[in-house]
Amino acid sequence: MSWGSTAKAVTSTTHRTLTGVRAGRHTCYDRLVLDLDRGGEGYRVRYVSAVHDQGRGAVVPLRGGAFLQVDDQSQAYRRIAMPSVAGYTTFRQVAWGGSFEGYTTIGLGVRARLPFRA
């Protein structure tokens, strides 16, 4: 893992279920965590001009100066509650982007295009 602002991706054949999303504040960074029912990796994280939801492709409204689209190779069988990031240094909003055919999308609005680690 390394810090940077370019897209990061890992593929997997493991079928997982997304069970929760949480956020944390640290001295030098904010952190977003996707809780899954089992291990394995399979994700893509990248800056986009707009986050699009799974299935329909509609734009997910987000606050912030830049937007990260987090696509995880996991299924969510119900809409997952998104954490509040009020008062965070970098995060502006976390939004549900849907789950469809084994992929789940989370939108993350941040204050500016900054390096991230996935």
Residues of each region from the PLM?
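Short linear recognition/processing motifs and adjacent strand/loop elements at protein termini
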Residues: M1-A118
